[in-house]
Amino acid sequence: MASKVIVLDFGGQYSQLIARRIRELKVYCEMLPYNTPLEKIVQENPGGIVFSGGPSSVYGEGAPTVDPEIYRLNIPILGICYGMQLMAHQLGGIVRPAEGREYGKTPLFILNRDRLFAGLNETEICWMSHGDFVAKAPEGFLVTAKTEYTPIAAMENRERNLYAVQFHPEVVHTPKGKEILKNFLYEICGLTPDWTMESFAQKAIREIKEQVGEEKVVCALSGGVDSSVAAVLVHKAIGDNLTCIFVDHGLLRKGEAEEVVRTFKEQFQMNLVFVDAKEQFLAKLKGVRDPEQKRKIIGHEFIRVFEEEAAKLGDIRFLVQGTLYPDVVESGTATAATIKSHHNVGGLPEDMKFQLIEPLKWLFKDEVRELGLELGLPESIVWRHPFPGPGLAVRVLGEITEEKLAILREADYIFIDELKKSGWYRKTWQAFAVLPNLQSVGVMGDERTYAYTIALRAVTSEDGMTADWVRLPYELLEKISARIVGEVKGVNRVVYDITSKPPATIEWE
């Protein structure tokens, strides 16, 4: 029985969001490139198909298209934005360039309030973002919604199970968008909302057992969300046949190494090899000021230490990696958005003779967090902000010394502590302190000081590709600043970074 939806990706900026929204409605969903052969789509046995939006015009040279036979499968199809224009164009309708682009929140006048629009009002708000529009619907199609400037904002052909909308139901700016998707999934496709993290974990554990058998497995554990959840999931499947290697390179946040040991060794009773490599990493970084060089040294040294430790474990065939679905999508579709970590120290070399276990490769980040909670990981790990592989090395500008690391660790700890206490930590994508290579004059007591400046950075983001700075309350910033200057020796000034990405990156180095 069909139990999933296929999203065909035409390169729209919201394509991944469509998949995430469908999964939030507890229906499993996969993304495939728009040019996936029809036989492959049929083999997948989907209960529904969604055509995503995209930047192209159906009349453009090399415009993405689909095999027209897809419309004869009698599988329910929902075309969104470009997906609607393509459906109209291929089935004999007329698509024209709009005189002006319709962009932003727009009143939607619903002409037929059953099936796709069941339970909605006659007028709803929708999010439009298009340059072309459907001027004439194909034969057999009923126009079901319009806007002031778009006479055909939605259309359907019930006999052929074809539905289309010109707006974006997947974005939050279409308030009833989730209801529309729900109607498509549950009422039109007849799918059951039974895809949960509990069912995913059970299936993943079975598959890991089948893949690994009695073989030994190793995992490079960073203490971040992805590697932590992957490690616990694999451990549930194979127990003591998994060994995790945790390398403390001396560039971690305050209490981080201790928390990893406490969580994985004590709480989960896992085989954990703890490598204290602080001295050798800091020795290699002595005198190095260039950020790219720092990154390369840390990456190279990490691989060397990991290989040494893995070799001590004897004959190991499998390596666990915390690859996520956006990485898979990015490598699989030329039109998809690029989502890649620029700081992945755990990027082990391709010539290592391991077979990969990637138990999270079908999940988005929010699903990984949900799975972590399902598996019993503490919230402090599950909700941890992204942390660069090179650690504090890219937050200490200029040369790295023990003194600078100690100052930054304490300042960062205070910043995060206050964000957690005030309820702001979970509202931010990433927050951290930076130690710029900058000293300034100050007065403390009656003494003149010449000490370091701490810069604070807090941003909101969906995926790290773009970010906006968080408008933290002045009272909170004042409290954080007073604590850092009062409690961290060697600091006499605190500044707050109010730059978005772009033009700045999230990290300073």
From Swiss-Prot:
InterPro entries: Class_I_gatase-like (IPR029062), GATASE (IPR017926), GMP_synth_C (IPR001674), GMP_synth_GATase (IPR004739), GMP_synthase (IPR022955), GMPS_ATP_PPase_dom (IPR025777), NAD/GMP_synthase (IPR022310), Rossmann-like_a/b/a_fold (IPR014729). ATP binds at S222, G223, G224, V225, D226, S227, S228. GO terms for cellular component: cytosol. The keyword ATP-binding applies. Keywords: ATP-binding, Glutamine amidotransferase, GMP biosynthesis, Ligase, Nucleotide-binding, Purine biosynthesis. The active site is at C81 (nucleophile), H168, E170. PROSITE patterns: GATASE_TYPE_1, GMPS_ATP_PPASE. GO terms for molecular function: ATP binding; GMP synthase activity. Pfam families: GATase, GMP_synt_C, NAD_synthase. It catalyses: XMP + L-glutamine + ATP + H2O = GMP + L-glutamate + AMP + diphosphate + 2 H(+). Catalyzes the synthesis of GMP from XMP. HAMAP family: GMP_synthase. This is GMP synthase [glutamine-hydrolyzing]. It comes from Carboxydothermus hydrogenoformans (strain ATCC BAA-161 / DSM 6008 / Z-2901).
